Protein backbone atom coordinates (compact mmCIF):
# COMPACT_ATOMS: atom_id res chain seq x y z
CA UNK A 1 0.00 0.00 0.00
CA UNK A 2 2.54 2.58 -1.12
CA UNK A 3 0.88 4.06 -4.20
CA UNK A 4 -0.49 7.58 -4.10
CA UNK A 5 -3.49 8.59 -6.19
CA UNK A 6 -3.46 12.06 -7.76
CA UNK A 7 -6.28 13.67 -9.74
CA UNK A 8 -5.29 16.91 -11.49
CA UNK A 9 -7.43 19.24 -13.59
CA UNK A 10 -6.15 21.62 -16.25
CA UNK A 11 -3.13 19.45 -17.01
CA UNK A 12 -2.92 20.12 -20.75
CA UNK A 13 -0.81 23.29 -20.52
CA UNK A 14 0.71 25.94 -18.28
CA UNK A 15 1.16 25.30 -14.59
CA UNK A 16 -1.10 22.25 -14.74
CA UNK A 17 1.17 20.59 -17.28
CA UNK A 18 4.21 21.42 -15.14
CA UNK A 19 2.58 19.94 -12.04
CA UNK A 20 1.60 16.82 -13.95
CA UNK A 21 5.20 16.28 -15.03
CA UNK A 22 6.39 16.66 -11.43
CA UNK A 23 3.88 14.05 -10.30
CA UNK A 24 5.07 11.39 -12.74
CA UNK A 25 6.50 8.54 -10.67
CA UNK A 26 6.27 4.77 -10.60
CA UNK A 27 4.49 4.83 -7.23
CA UNK A 28 2.04 7.57 -8.26
CA UNK A 29 -1.23 6.91 -10.08
CA UNK A 30 -2.01 10.14 -11.92
CA UNK A 31 -5.35 10.90 -13.57
CA UNK A 32 -5.46 14.18 -15.52
CA UNK A 33 -8.60 15.99 -16.63
CA UNK A 34 -8.53 18.70 -19.31
CA UNK A 35 -10.30 19.63 -22.53
CA UNK A 36 -7.41 18.29 -24.58
CA UNK A 37 -4.87 15.52 -24.15
CA UNK A 38 -1.28 16.46 -23.41
CA UNK A 39 0.76 14.31 -25.80
CA UNK A 40 4.08 15.49 -24.36
CA UNK A 41 2.96 14.39 -20.90
CA UNK A 42 1.88 11.00 -22.23
CA UNK A 43 5.31 10.48 -23.80
CA UNK A 44 7.12 11.44 -20.60
CA UNK A 45 4.88 9.15 -18.55
CA UNK A 46 5.63 6.25 -20.85
CA UNK A 47 9.37 6.92 -20.73
CA UNK A 48 9.29 7.06 -16.93
CA UNK A 49 7.04 3.99 -16.60
CA UNK A 50 4.73 6.22 -14.58
CA UNK A 51 1.01 5.36 -14.43
CA UNK A 52 -0.78 8.32 -16.02
CA UNK A 53 -4.14 8.45 -17.77
CA UNK A 54 -5.84 11.48 -19.30
CA UNK A 55 -9.53 12.26 -19.71
CA UNK A 56 -10.46 14.80 -22.38
CA UNK A 57 -13.42 16.44 -20.62
CA UNK A 58 -14.86 19.95 -20.72
CA UNK A 59 -15.15 21.15 -17.13
CA UNK A 60 -17.72 23.69 -18.29
CA UNK A 61 -19.95 20.59 -18.03
CA UNK A 62 -18.97 19.70 -14.47
CA UNK A 63 -21.87 17.43 -13.51
CA UNK A 64 -20.82 14.79 -16.02
CA UNK A 65 -17.14 15.11 -15.08
CA UNK A 66 -17.88 14.73 -11.37
CA UNK A 67 -20.05 11.67 -11.92
CA UNK A 68 -17.34 10.03 -14.00
CA UNK A 69 -14.70 10.79 -11.38
CA UNK A 70 -16.78 9.38 -8.54
CA UNK A 71 -17.57 6.19 -10.45
CA UNK A 72 -13.93 5.71 -11.41
CA UNK A 73 -12.50 6.22 -7.93
CA UNK A 74 -15.22 3.96 -6.58
CA UNK A 75 -13.99 1.20 -8.87
CA UNK A 76 -10.45 1.32 -7.44
CA UNK A 77 -9.10 -0.95 -4.72
CA UNK A 78 -8.70 1.45 -1.80
CA UNK A 79 -6.36 -0.96 -0.04
CA UNK A 80 -3.84 -0.49 -2.86
CA UNK A 81 -3.35 3.22 -2.10
CA UNK A 82 -1.57 4.97 0.74
CA UNK A 83 -3.43 8.22 0.09
CA UNK A 84 -5.34 10.32 -2.43
CA UNK A 85 -5.06 13.93 -3.57
CA UNK A 86 -7.31 16.08 -5.76
CA UNK A 87 -5.77 19.20 -7.31
CA UNK A 88 -8.32 21.64 -8.73
CA UNK A 89 -6.16 23.70 -11.08
CA UNK A 90 -8.32 24.37 -14.16
CA UNK A 91 -9.55 27.92 -14.78
CA UNK A 92 -11.03 29.92 -17.63
CA UNK A 93 -10.59 33.54 -18.68
CA UNK A 94 -13.18 35.61 -20.47
CA UNK A 95 -12.19 38.36 -22.87
CA UNK A 96 -10.59 41.21 -20.96
CA UNK A 97 -12.98 44.01 -20.10
CA UNK A 98 -16.21 44.75 -18.22
CA UNK A 99 -18.71 41.90 -17.94
CA UNK A 100 -21.18 43.60 -20.28
CA UNK A 101 -18.55 43.37 -23.04
CA UNK A 102 -18.38 39.59 -22.58
CA UNK A 103 -20.66 36.93 -23.98
CA UNK A 104 -22.98 35.26 -21.50
CA UNK A 105 -21.52 31.88 -22.50
CA UNK A 106 -18.01 33.12 -21.61
CA UNK A 107 -19.13 34.34 -18.20
CA UNK A 108 -20.97 31.11 -17.49
CA UNK A 109 -17.98 28.98 -18.51
CA UNK A 110 -15.62 31.01 -16.32
CA UNK A 111 -17.71 30.30 -13.23
CA UNK A 112 -18.42 26.70 -14.17
CA UNK A 113 -14.77 25.82 -14.77
CA UNK A 114 -13.32 27.97 -12.00
CA UNK A 115 -15.81 27.37 -9.19
CA UNK A 116 -18.61 24.92 -9.95
CA UNK A 117 -16.25 22.23 -11.25
CA UNK A 118 -14.00 22.32 -8.15
CA UNK A 119 -17.11 22.18 -5.94
CA UNK A 120 -18.58 19.15 -7.71
CA UNK A 121 -15.29 17.33 -8.28
CA UNK A 122 -14.37 17.76 -4.63
CA UNK A 123 -17.76 16.43 -3.53
CA UNK A 124 -17.30 13.44 -5.84
CA UNK A 125 -13.75 12.86 -4.59
CA UNK A 126 -14.80 13.00 -0.94
CA UNK A 127 -17.73 10.63 -1.46
CA UNK A 128 -15.61 8.12 -3.32
CA UNK A 129 -12.73 8.16 -0.81
CA UNK A 130 -14.73 8.44 2.41
CA UNK A 131 -13.93 4.86 3.40
CA UNK A 132 -10.24 5.04 2.46
CA UNK A 133 -7.83 4.50 5.33
CA UNK A 134 -5.05 6.73 4.00
CA UNK A 135 -4.93 10.53 4.12
CA UNK A 136 -7.01 12.54 1.66
CA UNK A 137 -6.04 15.99 0.44
CA UNK A 138 -7.66 18.66 -1.72
CA UNK A 139 -5.52 21.45 -3.16
CA UNK A 140 -7.34 24.33 -4.84
CA UNK A 141 -5.17 26.54 -7.04
CA UNK A 142 -6.32 30.08 -6.39
CA UNK A 143 -4.95 33.49 -7.37
CA UNK A 144 -4.12 36.83 -5.88
CA UNK A 145 -7.11 38.07 -7.86
CA UNK A 146 -9.34 36.10 -5.52
CA UNK A 147 -8.10 38.34 -2.71
CA UNK A 148 -7.66 41.61 -4.58
CA UNK A 149 -10.20 42.75 -7.16
CA UNK A 150 -8.99 43.94 -10.56
CA UNK A 151 -10.88 45.72 -13.33
CA UNK A 152 -11.32 43.76 -16.54
CA UNK A 153 -11.55 40.27 -15.05
CA UNK A 154 -14.58 40.30 -12.77
CA UNK A 155 -15.59 36.71 -13.53
CA UNK A 156 -12.09 35.35 -12.83
CA UNK A 157 -11.86 37.36 -9.60
CA UNK A 158 -15.28 36.08 -8.55
CA UNK A 159 -14.38 32.46 -9.30
CA UNK A 160 -11.13 32.63 -7.33
CA UNK A 161 -12.69 34.48 -4.39
CA UNK A 162 -15.42 31.86 -4.30
CA UNK A 163 -12.82 29.10 -4.49
CA UNK A 164 -10.96 30.52 -1.49
CA UNK A 165 -14.12 30.73 0.61
CA UNK A 166 -15.24 27.29 -0.55
CA UNK A 167 -11.88 25.97 0.65
CA UNK A 168 -12.33 27.53 4.08
CA UNK A 169 -15.82 26.07 4.49
CA UNK A 170 -14.76 22.63 3.24
CA UNK A 171 -11.84 22.61 5.67
CA UNK A 172 -14.24 23.29 8.55
CA UNK A 173 -16.53 20.47 7.42
CA UNK A 174 -13.70 17.99 7.04
CA UNK A 175 -12.24 18.92 10.43
CA UNK A 176 -15.44 17.60 12.04
CA UNK A 177 -15.01 14.16 10.46
CA UNK A 178 -12.77 11.34 11.65
CA UNK A 179 -9.95 11.09 9.13
CA UNK A 180 -11.37 14.01 7.16
CA UNK A 181 -9.55 15.41 4.16
CA UNK A 182 -7.06 18.25 4.46
CA UNK A 183 -8.26 21.12 2.25
CA UNK A 184 -6.13 24.13 1.31
CA UNK A 185 -5.99 26.80 -1.39
CA UNK A 186 -2.78 28.20 -2.82
CA UNK A 187 -2.21 31.40 -4.79
CA UNK A 188 1.10 30.74 -6.57
CA UNK A 189 1.73 34.29 -7.80
CA UNK A 190 2.45 35.50 -11.33
CA UNK A 191 3.74 32.66 -13.50
CA UNK A 192 4.56 32.71 -17.22
CA UNK A 193 1.64 30.82 -18.75
CA UNK A 194 -0.70 31.33 -21.70
CA UNK A 195 -3.16 32.95 -19.30
CA UNK A 196 -0.62 35.60 -18.34
CA UNK A 197 0.18 36.21 -22.00
CA UNK A 198 -3.52 36.77 -22.72
CA UNK A 199 -3.84 39.26 -19.86
CA UNK A 200 -0.74 41.20 -20.85
CA UNK A 201 -1.84 41.33 -24.50
CA UNK A 202 -5.33 42.64 -23.76
CA UNK A 203 -6.71 46.03 -24.72
CA UNK A 204 -5.59 48.53 -22.05
CA UNK A 205 -8.94 50.30 -22.43
CA UNK A 206 -10.62 47.31 -20.81
CA UNK A 207 -7.71 46.45 -18.53
CA UNK A 208 -6.58 49.67 -16.79
CA UNK A 209 -4.14 47.82 -14.52
CA UNK A 210 -2.31 46.16 -17.39
CA UNK A 211 0.95 48.07 -16.87
CA UNK A 212 1.01 47.24 -13.16
CA UNK A 213 0.19 43.61 -13.88
CA UNK A 214 2.93 43.37 -16.48
CA UNK A 215 5.45 44.85 -14.01
CA UNK A 216 4.85 41.93 -11.65
CA UNK A 217 6.47 39.47 -14.05
Task: Give a label for each model feature.
Residues 12-13:
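Conserved glycine-rich cofactor-binding loop
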Residues 47-63:
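Rossmann-fold cofactor-recognition segment
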Residues 82, 91-108, 127, 152:
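Conserved mid-core segment of classical short-chain dehydrogenase/reductases
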Residues 122, 159:
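Active-site helix of classical SDR
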Residues 143:
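Residue(s) in the substrate-gating loop at a strand-loop-helix junction
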Residues 148, 169-181:
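Active-site-adjacent segment of SDR/Rossmann-fold oxidoreductases
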